[in-house]
A protein has these predicted regions:
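Short, ordered loop/turn segments at secondary-structure junctions
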Residues: 19-22, 32, 60, 91-92, ...
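A Rossmann-like FAD-binding core segment of flavoenzymes
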Residues: 47-72, 147-226
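Electropositive phosphate-/nucleotide-binding environments in soluble metabolic enzymes
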Residues: 1, 34-41, 80, 107, ...
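Short N-terminal signal/transit or membrane-insertion segments
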Residues: 16-29, 87, 193-196, 205-206
Length: 226
């Protein structure tokens, strides 16, 4: 959306192709119990102020047969589009590193858990362990807590020294500070990672390597992201 707003100043016709049913991607996704974030609302208002910006939702590019041509697929049809300038904003892809038991029902990506919750999956009172590395863990924990889930543990694989360096930079992103402070310190453990997800027909508990040794936590969901 930011790219479209900047490009609209040229006066040309701007078309935003989005594979999602609404704008905002994963970061600004709303849902039944999650209102549209303020940042997204601001972007929507800016776009509405430009009559030369249009949206096409549920659309994805499947081919570029010729220079300046795109083949676009939608749920019920397909079409060819011509363009002079193309800006690709494909976002990031969540990295999921496999471990024993990673295919058990109840094991998802950290971003995947966020998407499920925002789409309406009920997690109230479910016991959740979040593991991996990076700020997405805090965001996933925050989303789960707002949906009334029980966040039992956040296992951060990065070393304590790296986490401290990251924490010193959080002043640049106030929202991340709020997410970090909303999680009890004892639940966030650096130098920790998943050894195994355990269960018969679905996830029952997770085995973690921590600075204090191997521990096992009974849980309903495990969300991992790197």
């Amino acid at each position: 959306m930011s790219a479209a707003i900047a490009a609209a100043e040229s006066g040309g016709r701007i078309l935003i192709l989005d594979n999602n049913p609404q704008a905002g991607g994963q970061i600004l996704r709303a849902g039944p119990i999650f209102p549209v974030p303020e940042m997204a609302q601001q972007k929507y208002q800016q776009i509405k102020a430009h009559s030369n910006i249009e949206f096409m939702f549920g659309a994805k590019i499947v081919a570029a047969p010729f220079a300046g041509q795109l083949l676009v697929e939608r749920p019920h049809d397909s079409l060819n589009l011509s363009y002079r300038q193309l800006i690709l904003c494909t976002g990031a892809r969540e990295l999921f590193l496999p471990f024993p038991g990673w295919t058990l029902p109840g094991v998802t990506g950290a971003g995947g858990l966020q998407a499920l919750i925002k789409a309406g999956t009920p997690v109230k009172n479910e016991r959740i362990v979040i593991a991996g590395s990076g700020p997405l863990l805090l965001a996933s924990a925050d989303t789960a807590k707002k949906a009334e889930a029980q966040v039992l543990y956040v296992a951060e694989q990065a070393a304590s020294s790296s986490v401290r360096k990251f924490a010193l930079q959080l002043w640049r992103w106030p929202a991340k500070i709020i997410q970090a402070l909303s999680l009890p310190y004892r639940l966030y453990q650096p130098d920790s990672y998943v050894v195994e997800a355990i269960g018969q027909e679905r996830l029952e508990r997770v085995r973690l390597q921590t600075p204090k040794g191997i521990i096992e936590i009974e849980c309903d969901r495990l969300a991992c992201g790197f």
